[in-house]
Structure formats: structure tokens, C-alpha cells
């Protein structure tokens, strides 16, 4: 088991105001936030805000002072990060004349990371510190437990509301807590994604063995919580990555050493698959593009494995020449280096360029892997056997390619199925990979021949997750696809500059078979031509799901949301809503109410199944879906009979009799007897404190105006028809039902159901179509998904289906 890297320095007191070095202020951050925190539109910059604060806590752990980090997503949209480290220094900074805590929060590049005495190595994705988080937050609250006292400070838009103040005794607490709300002035999206945060925090937990990281999501009625703690470090990380694969040797190979003031940790494990997964980190920061540490690792690995194969006589016996690619087939590895002053190719630190790191990594891997191979001959023989099999398959694939070149369907001639375009510039050319000959025929007739090519593929293509290169090249569909693209395949052959199209568009049916074929194609491109994805060349077509016909007019709708929009538009024609007060809503006022009702319907749909949505809806109208209700029990008790009365008005006469009560600390409980069976509906503290309840509560003033009492109800009038409306959900359903009258709705399952002109109008026309661009955010997560869905093991696939079955929406 790998030992933690942390060694507490002897004098914790050295970390004080004197350690804080100031470089410059924060104005530039607000003007160009993307330079400091990443993209402010796609969510990456938003999550980097959390990582910046977490990195400070992890730095405390690396220095040996913190053991637990808590990250909590709050119902109001804010995020709290807390650690049990030393606490940010609170004494006065001599150079600035204010507390060191205020300096750290308001000055760019201020912190202990610039003082080697405070932190030997430190993380931080952009190296800009928590001050940027403060600058880009609507508000930030800082609590510090240090030297027996609790200190508090608040900031609005990056500026201190008041100086740091002592608000009480720390008792047995120590550490720092930062709670911040991202500013809507900077970020177009301010909702944190649990899975994104979990992925990064899990990495940090693996890389810092012994540190506990707790991620908690309090935004919903049921708390979601993950406790991440891994004593095994990089060894356990590799086991986690390979959890769905069959290992070739019993345990991963662990290598760890400290040289030239750098720490190198590496774990590697071979499995029976055909793909390489190597994750690289410098000071806990991931390098997606590798760098000098990866180059050192690969050089040493190739040298030692091929050297052992030669010296043991196995390679000579099999008469094969081994390459680095052969050595890395089926390899999963995690390489982590701790470097005092690393240099990267860009601000986002995607590639390490510190030249001094390569010889250190190469030396450690050379020495320790050589020893392991000599000390474990039986396991080494298995590894070398796998490498030789890879070399033999590579040689067979090379011969298959040679045969292909000499055949009639060689590289020089394009497949007969391909309907090519006239344009020869790849940047202006598109290739549609279409499922089946019928859809292929429509696409060929409907396309713009000038720049759009069509390649129909019949049947399901080979699952490349379970196939070596030689088997892959024997597949007719794969061969046709490779030839059409023009790039070749394999490490030695693949040439991105020979790609004939810079838009490769997967176009399959909207049924189960179409989804399967799309997944098989994505597997092929991800495993064999990932550079196409990295360069943004791969897309998925989004043909419409619906065709609407009303009278002589026809319209195509791409998804359920577009269908709802259409039904609302038609349902509101000649429609009014008369409230119990006598006021009549129509036009834009009624449209806004229906749009709000749709939001409420969606929020109610998202609630846990244990909650009665009708009861929650009526409670929302009465404005009791908030935690403040616990502070005003009198109001809560008074609301109970009104909610019960409203529920009776919604029920059939034989199913009435709702009764309720409110208990402080618990919430509301409503019940009724239906055919001798008691039905119970609870609105507990978890629901009342959730973000969903908070959002529903925001609609209360509007809902109380529209639905002030259960009787008489509001009346929706359309032409000669009147419908009773008791709440927002019934309003939305009545309007969309009205919109369906006189409308012929056709749902497309297959592309072959469209004629060429329809396919052009909806899916091929560059001015009208919608496409999804394929990208990979987290390589290890993508590997896991392909392992689970396309790999040999059935159990992970079964568990995946069980977990996600209810969320699936596919046509059989």
C-alpha cells in the first residue's frame, strides 16, 4: 500500500501574515474572467471556482495539517467548502494594513503558495487563488477557526462589507469555511453539476490518500452524499479505473520514490482489453495532453518491458519486434508527480513542459519496473505474453492493410456505397454516415451534392471494444468507413491531415436499433480515431421527432419541448382564463402564466416519488414550501385546513375527506381514507428545505392571485368550451389538450419514413438543421462508460441498465 506523501513541517506557526506575498489587485479578473477561471458559459469556469477553494484545503492536507474537506451544494445555489486545517492567517498584514485573510480574499496572486516555506508544492488549476472566487461571486462568507477564536468576514461583489471580526470562541474547531454564490453578471450558467464535482473530488481523494472528501448536495428533498476516502492512493485509483475489466496480474505494480526534490508515484496494471488508459497529474492537477512526465514514463516502460522480453528469450522465440504501442495495449496507469515549481504549456495546465521532470520519472520507472520484472517472473511472463500477442496482431493488421491496398477496394478507390461530394477541400466537406439503404437513398437524393457526401452502412457494425485491429480490418463496414474517411487506421497508419471531411455526421433512427448503431460508431471513433473527436469533427444529426399537420400547413418539431411550445401556441388561440375575482387573463398575460405552469409541472415531476405531487402543488399555492414556516408555526397550522379543503375540491366526491396537521420540526402530514385504505402524504423538513421547494415557493404570489380559493375555481374558456382549473398543472394540461384538437401528429422513428425533400428541410440544410458536436470532457469517465456498455463483462452492464432504466426514453 502506498504511504501518504504528507510530512508535517516542524513549525506550524511559520504560516502567518508574513507568509502572504501580494502581486496585484482584482480589476483584471472582472474584466476578463475567462483568462483566470476558464469558460464562463459552458460550466467549466463555474466548477473551477469550487476547485480553487478545494485546492487550498488540499494544500493544507499536502502540508500535513488537514484530514477532512467538506464540499456542500446549498439550496440557495451557493457552495460551501470547509477544511480542518490551520485556518487562513488572521493577523494584520504589514504591507497592506488589513488582516491577512482580507488580503488573500481581495488581492490577486496573494497567498502562501508563493512562499516556499509555507507550501512545498501546491495545486490550483489556474494558480490564481481564492481571490478570483471572491471577485466573481455575488457574495462570499468566510469563517476561520484559528488560535481558539472564530473569525467571520463577508464580501459583496468582491469587496469587504466589514473588517475581519471575532464572533466567538472556536472551542475544539479549527480550519476555514468559504461559502460563495457565483455572480450571474459573470456566469451564464450558475447551477453546479454534482457528477462533475464528484469526478474531480474523487481524483483528489485518490491522489491524497488518507484525506476524506465529503460531497453533499442539499438542493433536493433527499440529500445526495458521497464520502470519498482512499487509503491505497494511486494503487486504489488504478483498481477503480479497471473495476469493469479482467486483470492479467493479481495486483497493480506500485512505484514511488523521491528524487531531486520531486515525488513520483505510479501504479500500472494490465487487463485483457486492447486500449491504453494513462492519467497524468502534476501537484494534483490533471494533464490531459500529458507532457514530460508521460514521455519519461513511456520511454522507461518500453525500454524495460522490451528489454525483459529480449533477455528472457521470449521475443526471439516468437520472432516479433516489440514497440511501445505493444507494451501499452491493455495498460491502465496513473502517474502522479509532485514538483515544486512546474511549468505548463498554457494557463489551463493541460501539458507539463518542465524538462527536469522527464529524467526523474524515467529514472524511477526504469529502476523500479526492472526490479519488479526480475522479482515476479511468473507475472512478468504473463505481461510479456500479452505484449507479444499485441505485436502479432499488429503484424497481422499490417498484412491485412497491405492486402487491402492491392485489392480493388484499395486506398486509391472509394467504396461503391459512398455517394461523394464535388468539393475537395475537407474544411468545406461533410460526410453523413447513415443507417441502412432506405435512409441512405433518401439522403443521397436530398443532399447538396456540392459539399455533402453520404455513406450508408447496412446492419450493425463491429463492436471494436472487444476486437483487435486484425479482426477490425476484416469487417466490411469498418473497412468501408476507414476508406471513405481516408485517414487510415492504427498508430503507424492514421494521418489526420488525410481526412477527407471535417464534418462527420452520424445519422441514425430514433429507435433502439438506431441508438445501438450510434453507440457502436461512437465506440469506433473514440477508440480508434479519437483525434477526430478532439478536433471537433464528429457530430450527431438531430432529425425532428415530430411532424405536425394542421389544415394545409405542416411543421417539423425537433423534440418534446418544441412539441409543447407548439401545443401551447395553438391551445391559447381564442382562449381566456376567468379568475374567481372576475378578472380575465388573455394574450401575453395568460401565456406567461402557462409558461410558469410548465415550469411548476417540471419541478413537481422532478420530486422524489415518495411525495404526492398534487399535495405539493396545493401547498405551493398556499406559500408554505419554505423553511421559514418552522419559525411561524401559527401560520403553518392556519394553512392546514385551507390545503385540505383545496385537495377535496380536486378529488372525486367519494374520495374526499382530506385532513392534515403540522408538527414543529417534522412538517405537514395530510391523510384521507379511500375505499377503506388510508392514503398519507407528508411534506417533511427535507422537502421544505430543498432547492425545488424554494423554486416552487417563488411562484406563490402569482399562484395565490390566480387560485386564491378552491371554489369557485378559475375557468378556462376556449370557443364554446369551459374547463375548471384548480392549479397550474391542470391549467397546463388543459391548454396543451386544447392545442391537440384538429392537429395530426406524426412521430418519426426511422429516417426512411422521410422523403428526400423532408430530410433536406429538417436534417441536411445547413441553415435549418440542429446537430450535436461530440466532445470528451473526462477521459477516464468516458473509458468507464464504454467499458460498461460495450465490454465483455455482463454484470456492470446489468447494473447500469437497472440504475438508468427509468430515465431512458427510447422507441422499441
Residue ranges and their predicted role:
Residues 1-812:
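Conserved phosphate-chemistry cores used by DNA topoisomerases
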